[in-house]
Amino acid sequence: MVASEPVKRLFEEYEKAFSALDIGRSARFFADTFISAGPNGTITNSKTELLKSASQAADFYRSVGQKSAKILSLDEQPVSEQYSLVKVHWGVTFEKTGKRLTEFDVSYLMQKIGPEPKIILFIAHQDEQKAMQELGLLKD
């Protein structure tokens, strides 16, 4: 992991929350307002909305059989004193795929103002729905 200590600590905790499908706990790492982006577009979110949909999101990942999530690599690139771009290479296991890791990348723009860094933007590099369909995880 190539990252500052505060960012490293944040992602160590975020990894635990994501692996446990504790979306409510994951929400604490996000700014009050943030942007989600991916191959299909962008949306703005609030932490309040994320918390409201937390159980639904966790239920979805359980329904496709997610068993674990692990950060395989993490690289932080400073943008300015207050911001950095963090690229995370994730490995996730599913019931259907056994111990074989499904790997994907997400980039996070971190705001480092205040006592802890916060995620203000995340960009999924791959189409999650398409990848899950290819793995046979989604029902038609």
Where are these regions (language model features)?
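Hydrophobic/aromatic beta-strand elements that line small-molecule binding cavities or substrate pockets
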Residues: 71-77, 90-92, 105-111
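Short, cysteine-centered beta-strand-loop-beta hairpins and adjacent loop/turn segments enriched
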Residues: 92-102
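Short beta-strand edge/turn micro-motifs at domain boundaries
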Residues: 103-137
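Short, low-complexity N-terminal intrinsically disordered segments enriched in polar/charged residues
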Residues: 1-32, 48, 137-140
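A solvent-exposed, acidic/Ser-Thr-rich amphipathic alpha-helical stretch
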Residues: 23-76, 82
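Short hydrophobic/aromatic-rich beta-strand segments that constitute the beta-sheet cores
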Residues: 36-37, 86, 119-121
